[in-house]
Curated annotation (Swiss-Prot):
Any Pfam family hit: Filo_VP35
CDD domains membership: V35-RBD_P-protein-C_like
PTM comment, free text: Phosphorylated by host IKBKE. Phosphorylation contributes to efficient viral replication and transcription.
Segments forming domain VP35 IID: 215-340
UniProt KW RNA-binding keyword: yes
Organism, scientific name: Zaire ebolavirus (strain Kikwit-95)
Protein name stated in the entry: Polymerase cofactor VP35
One of the GO biological process terms: symbiont-mediated suppression of host cytoplasmic pattern recognition receptor signaling pathway via inhibition of TBK1 activity
Cross-link (Glycyl lysine isopeptide (Lys-Gly) (interchain with G-Cter in ubiquitin)): 309
């Protein structure tokens, strides 16, 4: 054991076995450094004269005492070297994210403009549906006139004269008188061509609000029902049920012509078919304060599916002009009201 005294009066003890300092020596050196008893330069800068102490200080840096671990910040030169690469990577990543953001905004704008451009197509659906119905009626009328191959070359009177003379209709397209064809068909005239017979039957089953049947003084409940059905979308809805109730009560009170005129007037004003039916129940006198009819059914399954969501508990005094179409009464006595 040898003792060396340094110039400032501090004593350091070294042995050959102290080349590898233990935790006691490291802790002691840390304590002396923290209290200022040993200058920092003696430990870190005097490598040639005191290699043992410098080695101990180096070990102290790599293995700090738990008491001083959080009081000192160490910087690894490797981390310092790669910090610039991290910055460059983050910068390039930010650039890519910015480009993606710009592309997303551009794509969103294009999608919005595309949606705006397709709105007229959505609006065309109602127009196409209306055209489809009108065209079906027009084709039936067109077939009845037997003009599918060209323009008519003769009047209805000339057609009748030719038919009476030759016992058969003239060749080519011709005009036919509806009443004359009806008479020939009802008399089972064999000279009526099958195509004319089918065309007449198709037109007879296609009823619509035209000038001809609008002025018809003796419209039947069946014709009025078919006319109203042609204007309603879907099948078996609450409004279809309302049509049946209106036609039934109108027939019983001989008010079919009034109902027909009211329906046509509402449509002419631009009302929807559903609105026109509601207007009938409010304007035609026979429906004011009228109780809805009672329909006896076996089970709820007998009610059309489209009406299921419109069923309500029956109030004490339901009225048609207040939206109550009819009352379904089951076999067990339970009642359900159809409300629109």
């Amino acid at each position: 054991m040898t003792t060396r005294t340094k110039g400032r009066g501090h004593t350091a003890a070294t042995t050959q076995n102290d080349r590898m300092p233990g935790p006691e020596l490291s802790g002691w050196i840390s304590e002396q450094l923290m209290t200022g008893r040993i200058p920092v330069s003696d430990i870190f800068c005097d490598i040639e004269n005191n290699p043992g102490l410098c080695y101990a200080s180096q070990m102290q840096q790599t293995k700090p005492n738990p008491k001083t671990r959080n009081s000192q910040t160490q910087t690894d030169p490797i981390c310092n070297h790669s910090f610039e690469e991290v910055v460059q990577t983050l910068a390039s990543l930010a650039t890519v994210v910015q480009q993606q953001t710009i592309a997303s905004e551009s794509l969103e704008q294009r999608i919005t403009s595309l949606e705006n451009g397709l709105k007229p197509v959505y609006d065309m659906a109602k127009t196409i549906s209306s055209l489809n119905r009108v065209c079906a009626e027009m084709v039936a009328k067109y077939d009845l006139l037997v003009m599918t191959t060209g323009r008519a070359t003769a009047t209805a009177a000339a057609t009748e004269a030719y038919w009476a003379e030759h016992g058969q209709p003239p060749p080519g397209p011709s005009l036919y008188e509806e009443s004359a064809i009806r008479g020939k068909i009802e008399s089972r005239d064999e000279t009526v061509p099958q195509s004319v017979r089918e065309a007449f039957n198709n037109l007879d089953s296609t009823t619509s609000l035209t000038e001809e049947n609008f002025g018809k003084p003796d419209i039947s409940a069946k014709d009025l029902r078919n006319i109203m059905y042609d204007h309603l979308p879907g099948f078996g809805t609450a409004f279809h049920q309302l049509v049946q109730v209106i036609c039934k009560l109108g027939k019983d009170s001989n008010s079919l012509d009034i109902i027909h005129a009211e329906f046509q007037a509402s449509l002419a004003e631009g009302d929807s078919p559903q609105c026109a039916l509601i207007q009938i129940t409010k304007r035609v006198p026979i429906f004011q304060d009228a109780a809805p009819p009672v329909i006896h059914i076996r089970s709820r399954g007998d009610i059309p599916r489209a009406c299921q969501k419109s069923l309500r508990p029956v109030p004490p005094s339901p009225k048609i002009d207040r939206g109550w179409v009819c009352v379904f009464q089951l076999q067990d006595g339970k009642t359900l009201g159809l409300k629109i």
